[in-house]
């Protein structure tokens, strides 16, 4: 299908979803909290904040737009009767959340059947709300843009965790990039991508993302002038190994490096 025009009330509704999630997450943040592990082979935490925030958003979607689909991290996917699908990550950065560190956020995307047409990253503790539609991006209503950075030597690189880059070929790539950039920082999750859109970070690199990890961030970064793709240069909306760059020239340079390594 072709891209659809985004109805104006959809942005307002996306912000209502963010408000509903915030009421849940702020109830639990920096308080004693039971943590479950979703996987046997590694620590993949989930809390009542994750589950409750997603449930609150799903309830609102079911009431207001029952024909829309829902793709979320904590519950089963719902196929819609229309092309529109809400893509939800109630707490992106749960490890930071349970550690009391405000490098987490609620991710809300609206996919029109072709692409994420709207993205919201809400950090209710710091009262920051990033919004993008692929053409424009804002922080709390103020327009934002990425910064120019053509060369690796001038770049700030962020990755969620160094443990993701311990084995080849990931280790080889990370060794190459980290040795050439000016600065490397860790543990940003969705917050790192928004700092890229704000013009404070130049590269964010993550392997093995899910659609709900990246779809909300794509319209924000693209609206601020940046680029988000898979490591092979393909569409990142379905997740996988993802790279985001604030400067398209730097993105092209890194893709070439990846393909040659």
PLM feature spans:
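N-terminal subdomain of lithium-sensitive/metallo-dependent phosphomonoesterases centered on the IMPase/IPPase/PAP
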Residues: 1-91, 256
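Short strand-turn-strand beta-turns centered on an Asx-Gly dipeptide
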Residues: 113, 140-142
């Amino acid at each position: 299908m072709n891209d659809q025009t985004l109805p104006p009330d959809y942005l307002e509704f996306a912000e209502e979803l963010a408000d509903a999630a915030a009421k849940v997450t702020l109830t639990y943040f920096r308080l004693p909290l039971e943590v479950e592990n979703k996987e046997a082979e590694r620590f993949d935490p989930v809390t009542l904040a994750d589950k409750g925030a997603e449930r609150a958003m799903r309830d609102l979607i079911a009431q207001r737009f029952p024909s829309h689909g829902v793709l979320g991290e904590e519950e089963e996917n719902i196929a819609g009767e229309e092309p529109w699908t809400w893509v939800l990550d109630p707490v992106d950065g749960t490890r930071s959340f349970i550690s009391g560190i405000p490098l987490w956020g609620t991710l809300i995307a609206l996919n029109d059947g072709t692409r994420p047409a709207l993205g919201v990253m809400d950090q209710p503790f710091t009262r920051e709300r990033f919004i993008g539609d692929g053409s424009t991006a804002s922080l709390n209503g103020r327009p934002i843009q990425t910064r120019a950075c053509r060369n690796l030597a001038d770049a700030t690189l962020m990755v969620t965790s160094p443990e993701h880059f311990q084995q080849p070929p990931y280790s080889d790539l990370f060794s190459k990039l980290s040795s050439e950039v000016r600065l490397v920082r860790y543990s940003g999750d969705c917050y790192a991508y928004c700092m890229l859109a704000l013009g404070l970070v130049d590269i964010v690199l993550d392997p093995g993302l899910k659609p709900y990890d990246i779809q909300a961030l794509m319209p924000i970064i693209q609206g601020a002038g940046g680029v988000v793709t898979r490591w092979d240069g393909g569409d990142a909306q379905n997740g996988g190994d993802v790279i985001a760059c604030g400067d398209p020239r730097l993105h092209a340079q890194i893709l070439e490096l990846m393909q040659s390594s």
